[in-house]
Amino acid sequence: MSDRLTLLRPDDWHIHLRDGAVLPHTVGDVARTFARAIIMPNLVPPVRNADEAGAYRERILNARPAGSRFEPLMVLYLTDRTSPEDIRAAKASGIVYAAKLYPAGATTNSDSGVTSIDNIFPAIEALAEVGMPLLVHGEVTRSEIDVFDREKRFIDEHMRRLVERFPTLKVVFEHITTADAAQFVTEAPANVGATITAQHLLYNRNHMLVGGIRPHFYCLPILKRNTHQVALLDAATSGNPKFFLGTDSAPHARHAKEAACGCAGCYTAYAAIEMYAEAFEQRNALDKLEGFASLHGPAFYGLPANTDTITLVREEWTAPDSLPFGEQTVIPLRAGEKLRWRLLEDNA
């Protein structure tokens, strides 16, 4: 088995960079590895139109490290008031690549999200017309539904109907966490894809809850039982082009995670490809990593794959205990632990 792994430079098809003083840190971490990233729009206030997307994009570009060619791919935040005209203007801007459906209350800064999918059918029709993907946080949010069941219930109540109602619409089922979602995407038409995070490949809910609550493993959708983890590993390493890399790297300041009511999100951007390599190596599937990380996503979005490469070496190193996050700190996933793969820094 080789101790070096060279891949076409990957892209991240789902990331949270936040805004303001933290951008030089979050953008620096993603730009270290990835050429492009789909930028989540759940700011306060959210990114609701092409003008707001353009302004956020400029802030990201201004935060890039010197010499970086990192390209942010912007996303609109759908609300009950998003119009077909908003979608067409976003497409015409040339900088917006998708629109995001957050069920209201599903995750961080989703209170402005969609209260009923029926409310945005005209906007979804416009997405299908202009060829812009719909990105879906696939969880129901009703209080009586168990948090571990919310993804499956979303499939049964909404996702099947959505795919049937809009047969030409490209749909990304984001950060899938269940065997149910993996099966749904596998059996769906070719216009339905999914992203999978590193944490959902490497961990299950036991890692978060057994022996004490570990807040830095807490994300939404929440980690599930190990049988679902196995199904996600099967999907990611299958070579099926429907599945591609999306870190959902989502930083929160340490005090917001280590709290009586802590925020959801794992920060993985600083070492994401190294973690994915670890997961794929566990399955003896390192030969499938380039497809998952570098080829399937661009193909789904109708974009060219990158032509430059990165190289990983099998070399243990210790993840930092914390990282700068504006004037505060963020505790990354795997803080203080050994990682088995290291990115050669001359790739940056």
Swiss-Prot record:
The entry's free-text remark on the cofactor is: Binds 2 Zn(2+) ions per subunit.
One GO cellular component term noted in the UniProt record for this chain: cytosol
Q: Which Gene3D superfamilies match?
A: Metal-dependent hydrolases
Q: Write out the entry's keywords from A to Z.
A: Hydrolase, Metal-binding, Pyrimidine biosynthesis, Zinc
User: Which Cys pairs are S-S linked?
Assistant: none
N6-carboxylysine occurs at 100
EC annotation from Swiss-Prot or TrEMBL:
3.5.2.3
> What cofactors does the UniProt entry give for this protein?
Zn(2+)
Q: Please name the PROSITE patterns in this protein's record.
A: DIHYDROOROTASE_1, DIHYDROOROTASE_2
Q: Reaction catalysed by this chain?
A: (S)-dihydroorotate + H2O = N-carbamoyl-L-aspartate + H(+)
- Which InterPro entries does UniProt cross-reference here? Amidohydro-rel, DHOdimr, Dihydroorotase_CS, Metal_Hydrolase
What does the entry give for GO biological process?
Answer: 'de novo' pyrimidine nucleobase biosynthetic process; 'de novo' UMP biosynthetic process
Q: What is one Pfam family matched by this protein?
A: Amidohydro_1
**Biological pathway:** Pyrimidine metabolism; UMP biosynthesis via de novo pathway; (S)-dihydroorotate from bicarbonate: step 3/3
Q: State the protein's purpose.
A: Catalyzes the reversible cyclization of carbamoyl aspartate to dihydroorotate.
The entry assigns this protein to a family as follows: Belongs to the metallo-dependent hydrolases superfamily. DHOase family. Class II DHOase subfamily.
State what protein this is by name.
Answer: Dihydroorotase
Supply the gene name. pyrC
